[in-house]
C-alpha cells in the first residue's frame, strides 16, 4: 500500500466542479452522493475532496464545490452529517471564512445556517450551532434563517458562459434592449415637436383660465417657508394652480409661491376700506416654541403611605355619584398597580427567608436536643475512673491500728469508727460469707480487758448514715447491698426491740479487730468471689 493513497472521490469531484462547467451536472452530483455510502471511509474522503475544491483560488470552482457539499448533506444521511459536524470541518470552515472570496463566504454561511435549523433536534449534530456561536463572538455575521439574503447566497450565481452561442444570444438581447430604448426616445421627441407646432385645446383653456383668474387677499399672510408667498390684505393675486383645495399657487409683484386658499376671495369689487375693517391678521413669531410636557414616569417602589391614602380615598368616595374620579385618585391607583410585581417579589423573598430560618431552627433544635441528651446521660467512664482509684475502705488518721466494730447489725453493714472531724462516713457492705467468718472468729481475752465490766450498749451510732448501693466495676469485687426497704424495716425493728428491752438486754460483747484482720488495699489477700451485679447508679 503506498504511503499517500489517492482519494477515490477526487476525480469525480474535480469533474463536477470543473472550471469549464457552464451549469451544474446534477447527474454526476447524485452519483457522488450514492457513492458516499458504499464504503466506511466514504463520507470522510468525499468531504475532504470537496473542501479541497472549496479552497480553490477560482471562486467559480469554490461555488460549485459548495453546491456539491449542500447536495451531499441533503442526500447522504447522518453518516455524512457526522463528518460535517467534526472538528476537522470546523477548522476548514474557519480557514475559508478568513481567506475565501466574499461570495464563497456568504454561501458557506447561508448553508451553515440552514444546517443548524435541520440539525437542531439531534444533539450529536450540535457542533454546527456551537461553531456559528463562536464565530459570531469573533465578529462574523450570519444571515437569519429563511431571510432573503440567505436564499440569495444559497442560490448558485450565473455561471460564466464559455459557449460562443450563449455569448451571441446575450449580445443580441443587449442590442434589442438598446433599440427599444432608442425608439422610445424618438417617440418622445416627435410628441414634443408636435406640441410646439400645434398647441392643444387643453393648454389654451388652461392659459386662458390662468390669465383671467385673479383673487383679492382678505388677510395678511407672511410666508413661513421658502416656497410660500407673502402678501397684504387687499392685494390682487394671480392664481397659477388651484388643483389643491387648500393651498394655491399664485403670483404677485413679490414673486411666485404657495398661499392658503381661505385667505383670498374672488370678489374683486370690494372696497379696500371695508376689507380693512373686517380683516384679521395672522402673525407667526419665531420666538414661540411649542413644547409638549409629558410627566416623567416615576420609578416604581413599594410605598405604604400611598396605598393607605388610596384606600382612604376609595372608602370616602361615593359609588353612586356620577362625577368622574379625581385625577389624584386615578394617579394613586396607577401607582399602586405598578407596585404589584414589586410586592410579589418581596413576598417571595420573605417566603424564601422564612423557609431558610425554619430550616435553621430545626437544625438548632436538633443540636439542643442532642446536647440535652448527652448532658442527661450518666458519665460512666469518668465515674469508673474516679472510683477505680479509691481503696476498699478508708482508714482514719485519728484511730490506732485497731478498729472497733460493733456487733453485727441486722442489715449486715459494718461502720468504721473514725475521727470526729470526718465529714463523711463510709459504709462497707460485706457478703454473707465474710459476715459468718467474722461472727465465728475467736478474739483473745487480752484484746479488750474492759469487756466484762462495761454495760451493754446498743450498737447503733448517733450519726445517720445513708445506705447507698455501691457500683460494681470489673476491677472490684462485687458487694451485696440489701434493698433500701429491707434495710429500713430491719433498722426500725431493732430500734423497737431496744426501746422495749431497756437495761434487761443481755450484754453483747464488742469485737476488737486488729487492722491485720481486715483486707488491705495492696495486700496479697484474694478478693471475695464476684457475685451477680445489681443495678449501677450514680452516687447521690
Swiss-Prot record:
Keywords (A to Z) from UniProt: Cytoplasm, Endosome, Isopeptide bond, Membrane, Phosphoprotein, Protein transport, SH3 domain, Transport, Ubl conjugation
GO-annotated molecular function: phosphatidylinositol binding; ubiquitin binding; ubiquitin-like protein ligase binding
Region (Disordered): 500-540
Domain VHS: 16-143
Compartments, record wording: Cytoplasm; Early endosome membrane
Family label: Belongs to the STAM family.
Descriptive protein name: Signal transducing adapter molecule 1
